Structure formats: C-alpha cells, structure tokens
C-alpha cells in the first residue's frame, strides 16, 4: 500500500535542542518559505500547520505560501467555538480555490481550558465535543453546497449557504484527532481521516479498531493517519545519539514545569502521551525504535521514530499494516530534517503520488453578485 507522507511547519519555533535557547532559530516568513519549498520539491504530499496561542495563524501562513509552492497541500486548523461554521466554510472554500485544491482541514477542539478561556470559549470537555459535532455538521453541509437551517444546543444558523464553491468535490477532506470516546464518536460520524499521535503499535491498533467499528455502525469508512517525529540517520547508532542530543540541555525543572502545565489539560490524548514517559529522561524507548523524549517538554505529538532508513521504514510498515495510510512527520531543525527524511527514508517507502483535482469550470460567477446573494444569470438569446 502506498502511503502519504506530510511534513510540518514549525510556526511556534525551531532549533537544534528542545527546551533551550541554545541552537534556536528565528522562525520568520523566509524560513517557513524555505521549509515549504523544500517539502514541495522533496516529495512530501503536504504540511501540517499547527494552531494555538504559541503559533502563527495557520490560515494566513498557508495562504502566504500558496504562490511559492506548486503541489504541496496545506493542513490547517478548524477551531469550533472560536469561529462560526458558516464563516469557516467560506474561508475553507476560498483557501481551496486560491490553492487550486490544495487545502486540507484539521478539526481541533482544543485541550487546554486556560487557553480556550482566553479565546472566549468556556465549555467543558463534553460540551466542547457537542459543539464540535454541531459545528462540523454545519460546516460540511455548507461546503457541500446545501442551504442549511440548523438549531442545535450550541450552534444555530438559518439560511447558511456558500456562493463560491471549493475546487475539491464535494469539499476538502476533514482530518481529526482525539483519544476520548466522544472524539472517536465524532470521527466515526463526520470526518474522512482519523489522526492519532504516535503511541506504540498495540495502543494504536486498539484505537483504530474502535473508530473503525464505530464508523461501520454508522455505515461509514474512515481512513487513518499518525503524527510522529522522525530522527533518521545513516546508522541507527547515529540516530540514537541525535535523539539524546536533542534533549541534552533539558534540566529537571524545565521538564517538571512542562509536565505541570500539561497536567492542567483535559485532553485524553495529552494524558496518554504523558503516561508514556512519566516525566523522566530514562527508559524513553517505549517500543522498538519509538522514543518518547520529545514529549518531555512538547505538547501534542511527543514521540519519534529513531533509526537508520531501513529500520524506520520497517516501523512505518508496522503502522501501515494496521491500516494507517497517512504519516505526518517532523524533526528538529525542520529544514535540515526534511532533507534527511527525503534522502535516507524515502528510498525505502512506497510513496503515494500527489494528485491535484481538476479545476472546476465555474468557480467564479460571471459578473458581480447582486445584493450580496444573487448570482447573475446569463441573458437568454431570442
């Protein structure tokens, strides 16, 4: 089975070491452009752009990189509760049209109550998933060309519709990750691809089986993806030295402070990541060639595949055998590691070819929209 491999744009910072300013690198537009263009040239199918208060805005970053890339797809965040589903649908359609079908969307409910409160969202975990399900329903239907009336517990819209359709039909794919039962229910019912963070294969297998069964009960099928860091070198010994170097400047206080902050999250996925290492720097190889060192101080994806090209490819195949067809990778620093992954890992993988959709013949009305709602009609010839 061919696999899709994405890279990552580090809009929240980059460098040679975790948790340290030593070896840090300024992340400005020029640098992000270098990474995006490298990923485009090297054969990555797309890039994940992170979201949150520690990041640059993912939509603006994606839009700014459209003109300087050719085939690269952009996986950007949808934030239920922070933006209306109708406005989000218009923005999604615009990004898809401007990029000629290179837009992908990642539903992010959020897992840090403190950050969400700062955004004006004061729902608990259960309520957030209720609101996310309502948001996603409206967003999907509007993008698919329907006129939507919806009265839910959290979202109410009347006459919501889209005048400018997306390039991808019926709409751009929706990605989503979450480890709670509520998250899996949402994935089974409404998304195209369920993402998991890089847990050991046995744990990932359990999650896939649960989501697959829930989707089947609703008459749906769902694709699967995984989010991992990668440390690949010419030899496995070199790769492990590189992994240890990455956390060489981490002290116990920095780790403890990070873990205390993560403990305030209500994200089940973040809790599962923290349990893999227990906040300690020893015994970080939690499964063959799967290293939990990144998660000592980084929220979200906290594990890395470590080894030479053939070894890492073997571990990737183990995940692929579970049904995963999309791998979202990253590595520090992200520019150099994009080249390393391409040169040392790609020759051992069966990579899917990136295909762009055919441009729709009429994505723009002929003439100006009348009264903000009516598309001008062609005058009949007598």
UniProtKB/Swiss-Prot annotation:
Protein name in the entry: Alkanesulfonate monooxygenase
Keyword Nucleotide-binding in record: no
Pfam families per record: Bac_luciferase
Catalytic activity: an alkanesulfonate + FMNH2 + O2 = an aldehyde + FMN + sulfite + H2O + 2 H(+)
Subunit record text: Homotetramer.
Protein keywords: Flavoprotein, FMN, Monooxygenase, Oxidoreductase
GO MF annotations, alphabetized: alkanesulfonate monooxygenase activity
Family statement: Belongs to the SsuD family.
Ranges in a coiled coil: none
Organism: Yersinia pestis
Gene Ontology biological-process annotations: alkanesulfonate catabolic process
Protein's job: Catalyzes the desulfonation of aliphatic sulfonates.
Documented EC number(s): 1.14.14.5
Gene name as annotated: ssuD
Miscellaneous note of the record: FMNH(2) which is absolutely required for this enzymatic reaction, is provided by SsuE.
The keyword Flavoprotein is assigned to this record: yes
